[in-house]
């Protein structure tokens, strides 16, 4: 598995595989129930693994699964407009803002158990003193770290502090035609953003 974009965290106390597996097993993913908008928890990081942690060499792979219920706003608006037309036709009165909001909440409560589900996974890889999260989205990376901290009862970790952002540094390498340190440039590049 290749990570496409990475958010790194320096981990100061790496948990042991057995303890990590046991702790994440206690924070296992369950599907969103009833009126829940979403649910998240840890799951198998690979299709062939039956544990919460997949270990290889000196690395450990984990996965946080999130399922969100999706209710299109057009569907809610359509049902709300239907209800308002019925009230206006049957009772001969206009519907106020407060009553509209109550009707809207009732419609959402009725539709939520039947809503479509959007599923996603965020992967994390412990390697040495680092946790690499497979996302460039800071909020998703922090969410995985928060869930790890909740499951483990704490995990001292922080993002590395740099003098220059990695994207600006690598762009300069391309402009100069030469990389610094132990890096070297190849012939292909994909610029994003």
Identify the meaning behind each predicted range.
Residues 147-153:
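Short, surface-exposed basic-aromatic patches at helix termini and helix-loop junctions that form
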């Amino acid at each position: 598995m290749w990570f496409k974009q990475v958010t790194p965290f320096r981990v100061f106390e790496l948990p042991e595989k057995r303890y990590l597996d046991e702790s994440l097993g206690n924070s296992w993913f369950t599907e969103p129930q009833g009126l829940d908008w979403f649910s998240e928890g840890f799951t198998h990081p690979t299709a062939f693994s039956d544990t919460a942690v997949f270990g290889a060499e000196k690395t450990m792979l984990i996965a946080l699964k999130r399922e969100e219920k999706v209710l299109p706003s057009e569907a809610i608006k359509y049902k709300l407009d239907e209800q308002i037309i019925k009230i206006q036709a049957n009772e001969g009165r206009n519907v106020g803002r407060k009553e509209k909001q109550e009707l809207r909440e009732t419609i959402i409560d009725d539709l939520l158990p039947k809503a479509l589900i959007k599923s996603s996974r965020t992967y994390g890889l412990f390697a040495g003193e680092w946790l690499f999260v497979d996302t460039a989205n800071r909020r998703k990376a922090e969410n995985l770290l928060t869930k790890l901290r909740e499951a483990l009862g704490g995990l001292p970790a922080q993002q590395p502090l740099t003098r220059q952002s990695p994207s600006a540094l690598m762009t300069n390498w391309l402009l100069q035609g030469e990389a610094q340190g132990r890096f070297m440039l190849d012939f292909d590049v994909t610029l994003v953003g």
